């Protein structure tokens, strides 16, 4: 299994990137929490990876931190949670925020993540509660954090806004919902990555 890759960043189309590793191009899907930390195109970057093998495709997921990959692996062990939903969860919350929500049994926060209904959220609470406390600090670190919600508007005609909307749709949001979230952000100078970050915060 491919566990780690270091190479030159060739393309960035959230949540997907193309990484050149010694002449071989690897397509990876990243949660937005990892995507935000990527360098500029042409720069070197290193990612922890997890390979998902399906009958119709081999999907490679990348993570900036080992803790993100650890949580991803825990999530896909949960009944009813596949790689796409795990990616959406990690895009909506940091590891610390998710662990805190689980330990505090914040069902209302979990159901706001696209693709997570009440039954799935309840299953996550049952299957993951308590797992974070016994894991070493280098794997998980729980702290109290609450997301701030922006309350402004944005011109949807901006190219970064269009890219942000496309990325949110890829993460499981409906088109109308993605557009509404991006419109709430009032800073047209923001990059697509910044817009995605703020939109995901607003969704929670």
From Swiss-Prot:
GO molecular function: ATP binding; four-way junction DNA binding; four-way junction helicase activity
Entry keyword set: Cytoplasm, DNA damage, DNA recombination, DNA repair, DNA-binding
Region (Domain I): 1-64
Start and end residues of each stretch annotated as Domain II: 65-143
InterPro entries: DNA_helicase_Holl-junc_RuvA_I, Hlx-hairpin-Hlx_DNA-bd_motif, NA-bd_OB-fold, RuvA, RuvA_2-like, RuvA_C, RuvA_C_sf
Pfam families: HHH_5, RuvA_C, RuvA_N
Top-level taxon of the source organism: Bacteria
Places the protein is found: Cytoplasm
Protein family per UniProt: Belongs to the RuvA family.
UniProt-recorded name of the protein: Holliday junction branch migration complex subunit RuvA
Organism per entry: Pasteurella multocida (strain Pm70)
